Design a protein with these regions (language model features):
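Mid-domain alpha/beta scaffold segments of enzyme catalytic cores
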Residues: 1-260
Length: 260
């Protein structure tokens, strides 16, 4: 049994065959999925999916690459929305993305801090997107954690070892995607080996980043199996044991998510 802790089932890529995609996930041993918000205004679409499929849960938040679209969304509004539905089990994804020069860093930081406050108040995990922003992300995580702890996930981890270490030291989870399986990702596998077993999660980030076995294809939740296999190899344990560990970690992290 596995949990795909991060996918985007509301994206147009899946619209025509969502039933089949979720059926394939179940057939491959992926029991539950969390479909992640990239814009707060799309929450109704995510909830429609989560309400239709018992095994699908969702989050609420604004992706950093959309930060300027939703600067009016306050922490209070995020809290209100997060507490409005049983299927909303996380805040985000929010964070910092300096790879694409499309959003002002200050707008991204403002949004991130609001999402942190919402995670702190709701006790729901904040799904953090961090790309080419290791130093600023680590500094904000430390500063905000010094104020008061909050649960978080470093999603689709592809950063450096220092950010992984900071995340673990602050009590966060580190989630690995299909990037872990790429031949050129030995550095990410080396970092994954340093993350304690009780802090590991697996995800697809579908429809993006299909694992090596399906490279070049549209990603989907069933493919998280390949990522879990590689993560098991990295830690020198069986696939079955890694599946058990990451599933229990997912339920501990997403404490509002029920078992179905």
């Amino acid at each position: 049994m596995l949990i795909d802790t991060h996918c985007h089932l509301d994206f147009p890529d899946f619209e025509a065959e969502r039933d089949d995609i979720i059926a394939r996930a179940h057939a491959s041993g992926v029991a539950q999925m969390v479909t992640i918000s990239t814009r707060v205004r799309r929450l109704p679409e995510l909830l429609k999916i989560a309400e239709k499929y018992p095994s699908v849960f969702c989050s609420v938040g604004t992706h950093p690459n959309n930060a300027d679209e939703e600067l009016d969304i306050s922490a209070d509004e995020l809290v209100r929305l997060a507490e409005s539905h049983d299927k909303i089990v996380a805040i985000g994804e929010a964070g910092l993305d300096y790879f694409y020069d499309t959003q002002k860093p200050e707008d991204q930081k403002t949004g991130l801090v609001r999402h942190i406050e919402a995670a702190r108040r709701t006790k729901l995990p904040l799904v953090i997107h961090s790309r080419s922003a290791d130093e600023d992300m680590a500094a904000i995580l430390r500063e905000e954690s010094d104020k008061s702890a909050f649960p978080f996930i470093l999603h689709c981890f592809s950063a450096g070892p220092d950010l992984a270490k900071t995340g673990v030291e602050l009590g966060g989870y580190v989630s690995f995607s299909g990037i872990l399986t790429f031949p050129k990702s030995q550095d990410i596998r080396d970092i994954a080996a340093t993350v304690p077993l009780n802090r590991l999660l697996v995800e697809t980030d579908a429809p993006y980043l299909a694992p090596k076995r399906w490279r070049g294809k549209r990603n989907e939740p069933s493919y998280v199996v390949n990522t879990a296999e590689v993560l098991a190899e990295v830690h020198g344990i069986s696939f079955e044991r890694m599946a058990e560990i990451t599933t229990e970690n997912a339920f501990r992290c997403f404490s509002k998510m029920t078992r179905v």
